[in-house]
């Protein structure tokens, strides 16, 4: 496959109308933060000559998000349609999809002691597992400052003792977490969803909003995607 044939699709986090997707102090709104990271990742990948699409860029709902379900279910269905239409147009073997989010331990408007980075795939063995492995490699490389931050934060009581910088499940031989998430289960190409620390942990939020944190999160996505393309698509 030629580099010019590769189709990268990036996913933004939930709409602004979806309640509870922010830090307790409102300093971080997942919908805004995700779109900022997506924009930075998209620009960098395009500078390397790749074709990049975003599943949904506006903060608010579209009239095309039709149906009888909840707004969130209609939103997810819309995103999957966008991805699968591009897969049908260009060929799913030429496509990959990475949806970028920020995790939360609760939806109660309170700070919590959870932290860490992780990457989700659908259940079973697919090429998404290989994409997730590349994302984990990039996260380990780019989040060294966060590893030190969590270690210090655990001593100060900002994280519970069981927290680790990288959330993983090695029971099936790789690091990704498998879950029945709609956008990774229903899309036709290799697809992963990253949860980039926790929006309801004070230390995580401070890191995410710092220049160091923002650049690390963007850079790990760029590197993970490029590594996957080099290893499995070109």
What are these regions (language model features)?
Residues 1-3, 46-47, 89-92, 111-113, ...:
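Extracellular/periplasmic catalytic domains that process cell-envelope and extracellular macromolecules
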Residues 1-82, 103-108, 113-115:
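Active-site histidine-acidic residue metal-binding/catalytic motifs
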Residues 6-9, 15, 19-20, 86, ...:
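Active-site-adjacent mobile loop/cap segments within catalytic or ligand-binding domains
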Residues 7-11, 51-56, 91, 95-100, ...:
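Structural recognition of the beta-strand scaffold that forms the well-ordered cores
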Residues 15-17, 58-62, 102-108, 124-127, ...:
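Solvent-exposed loop/turn segments at secondary-structure junctions
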Residues 31-39, 43-47, 81, 85, ...:
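Solvent-exposed, polar/charged alpha-helical surfaces in well-ordered, non-transmembrane soluble domains
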Residues 73-93, 128, 181-186:
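Mature extracellular/periplasmic domains of secretome proteins
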Residues 127-163:
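Acidic, glycine-rich loop-and-strand cores that form catalytic or ligand-binding grooves
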């Amino acid at each position: 496959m030629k580099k010019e044939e590769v189709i990268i699709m990036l996913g933004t986090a939930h709409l602004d109308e979806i309640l509870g997707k922010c830090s307790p102090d409102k300093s971080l709104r997942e919908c805004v933060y995700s779109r900022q990271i997506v924009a930075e990742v998209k620009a960098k990948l395009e500078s390397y000559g790749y074709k990049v699409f975003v599943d949904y860029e506006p903060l608010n709902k579209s009239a095309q998000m039709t149906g009888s379900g909840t707004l969130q279910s209609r939103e997810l269905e819309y995103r999957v349609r966008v991805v699968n239409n591009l897969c049908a147009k260009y060929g799913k073997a030429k496509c990959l999809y990475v949806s970028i989010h920020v995790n939360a331990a609760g939806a109660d408007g309170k700070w919590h002691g959870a932290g860490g980075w992780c990457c989700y795939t659908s259940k079973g063995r697919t090429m998404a597992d290989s994409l997730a492995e590349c994302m984990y490699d990039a996260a380990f490389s780019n989040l060294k400052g966060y590893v030190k931050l969590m270690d210090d934060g655990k001593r100060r009581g900002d994280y519970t003792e069981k927290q680790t910088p990288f959330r993983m499940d090695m029971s099936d031989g790789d690091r990704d977490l498998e879950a029945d998430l709609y956008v990774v289960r229903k899309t036709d190409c290799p697809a992963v969803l990253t949860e980039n620390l926790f929006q309801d942990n004070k230390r995580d939020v401070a890191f995410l909003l710092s220049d160091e944190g923002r650049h690390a999160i963007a850079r790990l996505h760029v590197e993970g995607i490029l590594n996957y393309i080099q290893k499995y698509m070109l």
